[in-house]
């Protein structure tokens, strides 16, 4: 089997990807048997290509799965931890914009009664 490109895999459905994954795993086991029995050098060098292909297929499966989960949870109140933005612990606990801008009644009254003075500079 030739080297598989990730862009070719992205258009396929999940069932097709799983079928291809099984085929690659079967091929890898056959190549490993050939390695033990003393197979040709071309088969030995093919083991690396097949392993990388398996990794590519799994990567595409996982990425599409995560993408679908992101679409599903978009706009929902709660999201799984791995879909939330990765921030530091302190940043997660910080007040949000709305909470930062809230003012007490006393502070609102003070600002209303004593507005900021504006000065005109005489040239």
Swiss-Prot record:
InterPro entries: Ribosomal_uL29, Ribosomal_uL29_CS, Ribosomal_uL29_euk, Ribosomal_uL29_sf. There is a cross-link at residue 25 (Glycyl lysine isopeptide (Lys-Gly) (interchain with G-Cter in SUMO2)). Keywords: Acetylation, Cytoplasm, Diamond-Blackfan anemia, Disease variant, Isopeptide bond, Phosphoprotein, Ribonucleoprotein, Ribosomal protein, Ubl conjugation. This is Large ribosomal subunit protein uL29. CDD domains: Ribosomal_L29_HIP. The gene is RPL35. Gene3D superfamilies: 1.10.287.310, 6.10.250.3450. Pfam families: Ribosomal_L29. PROSITE patterns: RIBOSOMAL_L29. One of its GO terms (biological process) is cytoplasmic translation. Its main location: cytoplasm. GO terms for cellular component: cytoplasm; cytosol; cytosolic large ribosomal subunit; cytosolic ribosome; membrane; nucleolus. It is found in: Cytoplasm. It comes from Homo sapiens (Human).
């Amino acid at each position: 089997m030739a080297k598989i490109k990730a862009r070719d895999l992205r258009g396929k459905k999940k069932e097709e990807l799983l079928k291809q994954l099984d085929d690659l795993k079967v091929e890898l086991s056959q190549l490993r048997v050939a390695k033990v029995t003393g197979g040709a050098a071309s088969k030995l060098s093919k083991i690396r290509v097949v392993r990388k292909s398996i990794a590519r297929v799994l990567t595409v499966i996982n990425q599409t799965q995560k993408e679908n989960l992101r679409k599903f949870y978009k706009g929902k109140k709660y999201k799984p931890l791995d879909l939330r933005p990765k921030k530091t612990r302190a940043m997660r606990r910080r007040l949000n914009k709305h909470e930062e801008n809230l003012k007490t009644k006393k502070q609102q009254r003070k600002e209303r009664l004593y507005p900021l003075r504006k000065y005109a500079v005489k040239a």
